[in-house]
């Protein structure tokens, strides 16, 4: 098969998609390259539809091969094993979300999209290549797909918007978002920003949409050049007579049930209406329960949308821009370092903050290199929060994605390491959920930080926006319920301070969004954020002056860089002993800065004194009790503190003449000595005799008397001359 090559230009660099040479047995395959980053994206699908499937059976996988960055995996087996990394999970979601709405209703063939990172240049992130490759592979495959779409990353560097900035440039960008779109408009947005206005964010989003259009052009060229004929999908026909009869039987009851203000009451009322429907239809429809359930769900969705679009109200009675009642509490857990309970309507989230030292930083192996992360946020969504019974397992893709969104929204307001040198872990425990638990996570975790005395730059709140649209009728909803998310057309989450946006995430179920709708949603979200922020600040208006008494205290000691080796000791022996002795955590960096994390002042005092004793250069006149560690003919080397030895010359051992060093001291002896001199090179001269009492005159003369001479010695001969 002939290889086809298609090329566009993004930010002055070639963006290439190739097909026809690799993975030819897949339904579609695209090799995507930008810079020296290359990904292979494949799509495969079952030949028969999945029986009784009432959902889209699509799975998306993203695999980072460590060899792509010229490295060998650091685990015991030296191969890629185990569950996907956090980065892989997030990129799976990023790839899945824009393509999922573009499959037709009634498509039930099991479908799998796999992205494999083959080459990584550490400057161009593979995530946007994965989205483009997935669209390209689906576009040329035989699968029905209402694409193509494309994606770019948008950064703002020194006030200038840039498409697909490099990883190095992103460090200096105050906007970092991924924009996915079709030719007609924006489909998905995900990213963060360093407190920018709604107008600036809107400009960045549509700058990204313009930048991705050339990538859609080359996919159209691919489809024309090598696209396969599409499968014909015939969705199951609706029984319109049955649909009408269901509406006649329970339409009014559904309209009444969905307007129950509380989630459980609404769910219970709809369940009763559905049971009444089965009874009303009778035994003649007993074998069509699955079909009836589907038609009933369609009716509920239709009624809910009608209430919003034609009656101008929401199913729980709120106005379109109204936020549910909010309550906030701080300091709810006495022994944690910071805690807060945030409740908005029937969504309740407990935020807990823990402080640690540099030892507690998360260490991660990525294609960009090994990283340490001093800030972590973990989101937990137990089944009881929605009244369900499920097996409790590790974090799901959804949990990781929601936690990452909250992490991004908060990270921009955290203090830098120079101001607050702690590792921070936030945990979100969702206790109740009826929409927007990720935004509840942001609010509860910010309050937990403030309760724990973390000097954040500004408080952050978050809100989830929804959309119901039908032709010219459009309703933008603030603080959506779970049901509004289900029957609506958009889920748009925005976090920010009073002054601007810190993170956003948008997914839609329709083909695209116009600029006008996005602008309205952003400004309505700002009003909601400010309202929520006001309620939060009523609970705690400013971060506390002091951290929790149960949190570790960080103390800084400076030593000369030459002393680092002595602090650490051979194989880390000395620093381990210091930590065990003082019950502290001690870190030393290359500049000679020693950080001591202690739970009490007494533990800190012990560690500080020990470090200072090792790190300080002895001065003449100081007295130490040391240990003899080496003996030579000319003296004894005495260790006066960890890693520091000095020489006590044989002449400095006693006031009288010493024939052999071992006549006075032996290996391991404890000896009190005085520092006589410290040379510029750091060599230390010690004296033992300086601390001994001066001998009596006669005793000194006796011990110092000359040794007896042999008869006939030289002295006599000299005298006889």
Curated annotation (Swiss-Prot):
Gene3D superfamilies: GHMP Kinase, N-terminal domain, K Homology domain, type 1, Nucleic acid-binding proteins
UniProt keyword terms in alphabetical order: Cytoplasm, Magnesium, Metal-binding, Nucleotidyltransferase, RNA-binding, Transferase
Protein name: Polyribonucleotide nucleotidyltransferase
Listed Pfam families: KH_1 (PF00013), PNPase (PF03726), RNase_PH (PF01138), RNase_PH_C (PF03725), S1 (PF00575)
Source organism of the structure: Desulfosudis oleivorans (strain DSM 6200 / JCM 39069 / Hxd3) (Desulfococcus oleovorans)
Domain of life: Bacteria
One of the GO BP terms on file: mRNA catabolic process
Annotated function: Involved in mRNA degradation. Catalyzes the phosphorolysis of single-stranded polyribonucleotides processively in the 3'- to 5'-direction.
Ranges in coiled-coil conformation: none
Primary subcellular site in the record, as a coarse category: cytoplasm
UniProt domain S1 motif: residue ranges: 621-689
Keyword NADP carried by entry: no
């Amino acid at each position: 098969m002939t290889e086809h090559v298609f090329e566009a230009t993004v930010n002055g660099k070639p963006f290439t998609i190739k097909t026809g040479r690799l993975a030819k047995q897949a339904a579609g395959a695209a090799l995507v390259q930008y810079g020296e980053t290359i990904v292979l994206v494949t799509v495969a699908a079952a030949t028969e539809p999945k029986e009784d499937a009432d959902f889209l059976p699509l799975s998306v996988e993203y695999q980072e091969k460590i060899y792509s960055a010229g490295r060998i995996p650091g685990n015991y087996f030296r191969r890629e094993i185990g569950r996907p990394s956090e980065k892989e999970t997030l990129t799976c979601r990023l790839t899945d979300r824009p393509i999922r709405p573009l499959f037709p209703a009634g498509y039930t063939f099991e479908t799998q999209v796999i992205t494999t990172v083959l080459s990584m240049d550490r400057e161009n992130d593979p995530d946007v290549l994965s989205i483009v490759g997935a669209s390209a592979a689906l576009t040329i495959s035989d699968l029905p797909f209402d694409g193509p779409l494309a994606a770019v990353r948008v950064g703002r560097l020194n006030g200038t918007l840039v498409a697909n900035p490099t990883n190095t440039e992103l460090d200096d960008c105050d906007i970092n978002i991924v924009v996915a779109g079709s030719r007609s408009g924006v489909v998905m947005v995900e990213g963060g920003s360093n407190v920018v206005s709604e107008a600036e964010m809107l400009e960045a989003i549509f700058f990204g949409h313009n930048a991705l259009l050339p990538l859609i052009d080359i996919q159209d060229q691919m489809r024309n050049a090598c696209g396969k004929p599409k499968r014909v999908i015939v969705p199951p026909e609706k029984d319109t007579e049955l649909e009408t009869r269901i509406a006649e039987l329970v339409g009014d009851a559904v309209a009444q049930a969905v307007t129950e203000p509380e989630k459980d009451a609404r769910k219970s009322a709809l369940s009763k209406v559905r049971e009444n429907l089965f009874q009303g239809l009778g035994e003649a429809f007993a074998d069509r329960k699955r079909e009836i359930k589907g038609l009933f769900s369609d009716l509920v969705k239709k009624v809910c949308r009608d209430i919003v679009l034609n009656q101008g109200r929401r199913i729980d009675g709120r106005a379109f821009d109204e936020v549910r009642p909010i309550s906030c509490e701080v300091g709810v857990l006495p022994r944690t370092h910071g805690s807060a309970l945030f409740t908005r309507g029937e969504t309740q989230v407990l935020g807990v903050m823990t402080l640690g030292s540099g030892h507690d930083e998360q260490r991660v192996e990525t294609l960009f290199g090994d990283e340490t992360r001093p800030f972590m946020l973990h989101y937990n969504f137990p089944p009881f929060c929605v009244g369900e019974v499920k097996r409790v397992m590790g974090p799901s893709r959804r949990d990781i994605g929601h936690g990452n969104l909250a992490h991004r929204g908060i990270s921009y307001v955290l203090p830098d390491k120079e101001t607050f040198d702690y590792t921070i872990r936030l945990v979100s425990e969702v206790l109740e959920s009826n929409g927007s638990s990720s935004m509840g996570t942001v609010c509860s975790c910010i309050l937990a930080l403030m309760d724990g005395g973390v000097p954040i730059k500004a408080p952050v709140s978050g809100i989830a926006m929804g959309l119901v649209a039908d032709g010219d009728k459009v309703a933008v909803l603030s603080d959506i319920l779970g049901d509004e998310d289900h029957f609506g057309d958009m889920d748009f989450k925005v976090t920010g301070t009073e002054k601007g946006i810190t993170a956003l995430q948008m997914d839609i179920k329709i083909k695209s969004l116009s600029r006008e709708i996005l602008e309205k949603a952003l400004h309505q979200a700002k009003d909601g954020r400010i309202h929520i922020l006001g309620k939060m600040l009523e609970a705690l208006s400013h971060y506390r002056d002091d951290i929790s008494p149960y949190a570790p205290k960080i103390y800084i000691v400076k030593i000369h860089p030459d002393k680092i080796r002595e602090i650490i000791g051979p194989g880390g022996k000395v620093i381990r002993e210091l930590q065990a002795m003082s019950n502290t955590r001690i870190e030393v960096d290359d500049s000679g800065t020693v950080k001591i994390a202690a739970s009490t002042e007494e533990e800190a005092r012990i560690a500080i004194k020990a470090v200072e004793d090792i790190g300080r250069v002895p001065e003449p006149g100081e007295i130490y009790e040391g240990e003899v560690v080496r003996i030579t003919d000319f003296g004894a080397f005495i260790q006066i503190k960890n890693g520091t030895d000095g020489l006590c010359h044989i002449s400095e051992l006693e006031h009288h003449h010493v024939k052999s060093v071992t006549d006075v001291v032996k290996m391991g002896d404890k000896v009190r000595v005085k520092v006589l001199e410290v040379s510029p090179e750091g060599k230390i001269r010690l004296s033992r005799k300086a601390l001994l009492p001066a001998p009596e005159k006669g005793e000194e003369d006796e011990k110092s008397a000359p040794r007896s001479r042999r008869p006939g010695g030289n002295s006599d001969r000299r005298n006889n001359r």
